[in-house]
């Protein structure tokens, strides 16, 4: 895997600036240069020894493009990887980057829009490489961190990477940055990409990989001066979309009386949709394999829907909530199902991206989410409930 690299000549990214000063110019000091070079190269060799045994998941579509992506990472400083939900790009790209020789002179930083995704994806990658979380694969979110500077891959929220820029403006801890779900275009993501565009001029050794849904890739490519785009296919089966009858209510926003009416009718509509899904599963001959993922706007709404479904929904069905503040034990029930029988997962938009909830056959989408918005007038960050975008709707559709 590392045959294209001369490991003897590699040094840690954080040491390269000091080595440049010691190697030439008025601060040149051959003795100190040699000492620092040998010390830094020893760290690189230690990282080579710590590289995990990587076996890509052959069931995921992205692995078909692994050789092409490895060559692209080695050749270009910035690449864009476009793929639909279910392609496996979130869990496989860090491993493909390691196969391309990245992670030796610094960590592979992999950003996620949400804390839940950062934790669950890091756990999944650690399992795939056969290690405990916190060894070569770690994560860092607010108030929680596993791993160290010696880790090869670090999952984190985009907010954590932004915070690190305040005290490490050259991102010397990293030799590769992966920006996942860039199409979400949050303030953090946009700021990071703007910063990276300037940083790559000063750090030619830094590689940047941007992943996105297929809608915005040309815009990202143009922004990074024609960076190559690699499209990865998603699911290999069609998804049937059924629409509930159109309501006469004109939904405008969470402050609207009409939206309140919509919220009152939502539990009833969800129960009807669940019954329709289970009926469809019975007609198609797989009644025991009909897990449902329901997208809801808020944690409170999830609790209300859970209570309604427990009272009025189908029997012998496990109903589980999924939101950002959920404990690790509760998350494990969702991502590692152990029991038999049907499940209904009620989630906020944390389930839109990154790790796919297993065994989902049906998705019920309310079409709304609580979305972070910055108010220029009041100068505060708000979380209004809004209708989701077409890109988000496609992401949700792809969860089954």
Report the location of each language-model feature.
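P-loop NTPase motor module signature
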Residues: 1-400
